[in-house]
């Protein structure tokens, strides 16, 4: 009814309070995270990591701010949870979780990475490095790339080859 009032009493329900908290916090997250809006109209601000995983109903992409800082977003459109979803990533030392739509504060189960995810020198999706993350059912996780990926020095590479 467009002429009536909103049903304000609905905010008394705990599940609606959690949903309200979710929208408050994701809007604040958007505003404070320049990678989500700063380079909106240029491909330099966006990169597909996993654009075509229709079997798992997952997409993963990066957003970048003007300083080149990466924010990875993995979205699961399926009723399955993924505990070890591997994808190729830019060479950072690690990816740190910064927002999870499955947080219990929003009515979720809290499934996702709570600690930093280390990047490994395991090729995947056309990249020389990859990471394995946890993605919740019908949810999204946002992770910030941190630090340069450690490259082995030439002496270390030579020693490693001698051992084999």
Each model region followed by its residue ranges:
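Carbohydrate-interacting/catalytic domains
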Residues: 1-164
């Amino acid at each position: 009814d467009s002429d009536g009032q909103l049903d304000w009493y609905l905010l008394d329900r705990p599940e609606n309070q959690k949903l309200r908290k979710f929208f408050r916090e994701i809007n604040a997250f958007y505003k404070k995270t320049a990678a989500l809006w700063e380079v909106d109209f240029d491909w330099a601000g966006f990169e597909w990591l996993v654009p075509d995983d229709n079997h798992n109903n997952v997409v993963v992409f990066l957003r970048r701010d003007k300083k080149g800082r990466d924010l990875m977003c993995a979205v699961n459109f399926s009723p399955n949870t993924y505990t070890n979803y591997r994808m190729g990533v830019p060479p950072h030392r690690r990816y740190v979780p910064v927002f999870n739509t499955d947080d219990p504060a929003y009515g979720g189960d809290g499934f996702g990475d709570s600690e930093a995810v280390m990047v490994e020198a395991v090729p995947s999706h056309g990249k020389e490095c990859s990471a394995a993350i946890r993605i919740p059912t019908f949810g999204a996780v946002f992770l910030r790339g941190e630090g340069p990926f450690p490259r082995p020095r030439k002496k270390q590479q030579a020693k490693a080859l001698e051992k084999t």
